[in-house]
Curated annotation (Swiss-Prot):
This is Hydroxyacylglutathione hydrolase. Monomer. It comes from Alkalilimnicola ehrlichii (strain ATCC BAA-1101 / DSM 17681 / MLHE-1). It is an enzyme of class 3 (hydrolase). The gene is gloB. The keyword Zinc applies. It holds the Pfam family Lactamase_B. Thiolesterase that catalyzes the hydrolysis of S-D-lactoyl-glutathione to form glutathione and D-lactic acid. Disulfide bonds: none annotated.
């Protein structure tokens, strides 16, 4: 059975370790820094079997070359981005098993945050990188609102029980923004309180469940009247299509 373990890195990154404790093997997702990965492997007596990358940003790839120097393992990453060390380029609809773990993953193209961003989907789990966050989504550094809205639609179509393993601990800021958009959403108010309590205890707020995102994440709720009304009020524009609502929400969040 595969266990997913969070490795905090930098100020707010999460590196994810997919672990088979019986085989004493692990695969790492988005290792922005090699040192905490090596420390986690040593502490649990694990050997690295693969490196998995969602997008090219350095805080998700900065540890790849150092890890490869110590562990000559395959590196899976986006085919349409330049990531040092990638030996197994991926794009939708590729599917593969993680070496040593037997964990099946399928690939979704989710451009928006970066042009070639991919997400990795297992049974009941999503490694979303910086595409979908708990309560939010990634900034549009390279893609368009239309691309990101379509990408989030793919992710939102996954089963509600899917656990979302995202790349950053941005949840409090995301939910506080979401509460500006939907102050009368009781699910959002409850989730914000739970997240605040978790952070006060020093606990992570991720993974979330896709059901939580459907109920509280404004970027997955751009089709709803209350969200559209809030976006129109902020933008001072009539927004006839959900993608226009999404684009206004993203600008609003960027400026908040």
């Amino acid at each position: 059975m595969t266990e997913i373990v969070a490795i905090p890195a930098f100020a707010d990154n999460y590196i994810w370790l997919a672990v088979d404790r019986n085989r004493r093997l692990a695969a790492v997702v988005d290792p922005g820094d090699a040192e905490p990965v090596e420390a986690a492997l040593r502490a649990s007596g694990l050997r690295l079997s693969a490196i998995l990358i969602t997008h090219h940003h350095h805080d998700h790839t900065g540890g790849v070359e150092e890890l490869l120097a110590a562990h000559p393992v395959p590196v899976y990453g986006p085919a349409d981005e330049s990531v040092p060390g990638v030996s197994q380029p991926l794009r939708e609809p590729d599917a593969f098993e993680v070496p040593g773990l037997g964990l099946p993953l399928r690939v979704l193209d989710v451009p928006g945050h970066t042009a070639g961003h991919i997400a990795l989907v297992a049974d009941g789990a999503l490694f979303s990188g910086d595409a979908l966050f708990a309560g939010g989504c990634g900034r549009l550094f390279e893609g368009t609102p239309e691309q990101m809205y379509a990408s989030l639609g793919k992710l939102a179509a996954l089963p509600e029980a899917t656990r979302v393993y995202c790349g950053h601990e941005y949840t409090l800021a995301n939910l506080r923004f979401a509460h500006q958009v939907e102050p009368d959403n009781p699910n959002l108010t409850q989730r914000l309180r739970q997240a605040e309590a978790a952070r006060q205890r020093g606990e992570p707020t991720v993974p979330s469940r896709m059901a939580d995102e459907h109920a509280t994440n404004p970027f997955l709720r751009a089709h709803l009247p209350a969200v559209r009304t809030a976006a129109e009020r902020w933008s001072g524009q009539t927004l006839d299509e959900p993608v226009a609502v999404f684009a206004a929400l993203r600008r609003w969040k960027d400026q908040s």
